[in-house]
Amino acid sequence: MICSTLLAVEAAEKNGLFDLDATLPIIAVQFLLLVAVLNSLFYEPVTRVIDSRNDYIRTTQAEAQERLDKAMALTRQYEAEIGQARLQAQQVIAEAEAAAARIRSEKLAAAQAEIQAKLEAARRQIEQEKQTALEQLQQQVDAIAAQITEKLLGSAR
């Protein structure tokens, strides 16, 4: 290994660091050919694949954004419809509660009126029976008084 390094140093001293002979242009031409071949065989296809992939990503993102926008619009629409349905349901519930309260108050008023009428009828009947009982009692009192009077007058004679 040391030998090869020494040979390289001797060769460099003998010919110099850069010899301006035909090797430099040949190396330059080889480099340019290599760049051209790599460009046509590797870089352009890779660039095309990368560009097509970027295009695919852009279109996919655009489609995804459109779908997201549509989904958001549908969500807003459905939320608005749900809000309307809730309002309608609340109105129906309020109307039903009002109708139930009205029916309850009507039935309560009717029941109170019926109870009041029955109570009044019972009072009248009680008053009538009281009057009848008082009249019968008065008749019995009169009859007993007449009998007592007769007995008193009959025994006094």
UniProtKB/Swiss-Prot annotation:
InterPro entries: ATP_synth_b, ATP_synth_B-like_membr_sf, ATP_synth_b/b'su_bac/chlpt, ATP_synthase_B_chain. The keyword Thylakoid applies. Disulfide bonds: none annotated. The chain crosses the membrane at residues 22-42. It is found in: Cellular thylakoid membrane. GO terms for molecular function: proton-transporting ATP synthase activity, rotational mechanism; proton-transporting ATPase activity, rotational mechanism. Keywords: ATP synthesis, CF(0), Hydrogen ion transport, Ion transport, Membrane, Thylakoid, Transmembrane, Transmembrane helix, Transport. It holds the Pfam family ATP-synt_B. It comes from the Bacteria. It is a single-pass membrane protein. GO terms for cellular component: plasma membrane-derived thylakoid membrane; proton-transporting ATP synthase complex. SUPFAM superfamilies: F1F0 ATP synthase subunit B, membrane domain. Belongs to the ATPase B chain family. F(1)F(0) ATP synthase produces ATP from ADP in the presence of a proton or sodium gradient. F-type ATPases consist of two structural domains, F(1) containing the extramembraneous catalytic core and F(0) containing the membrane proton channel, linked together by a central stalk and a peripheral stalk. During catalysis, ATP synthesis in the catalytic domain of F(1) is coupled via a rotary mechanism of the central stalk subunits to proton translocation. F-type ATPases have 2 components, F(1) - the catalytic core - and F(0) - the membrane proton channel. F(1) has five subunits: alpha(3), beta(3), gamma(1), delta(1), epsilon(1). F(0) has four main subunits: a(1), b(1), b'(1) and c(10-14). The alpha and beta chains form an alternating ring which encloses part of the gamma chain. F(1) is attached to F(0) by a central stalk formed by the gamma and epsilon chains, while a peripheral stalk is formed by the delta, b and b' chains. This is ATP synthase subunit b'. The lineage of its organism: Bacteria, Bacillati, Cyanobacteriota, Cyanophyceae, Synechococcales.
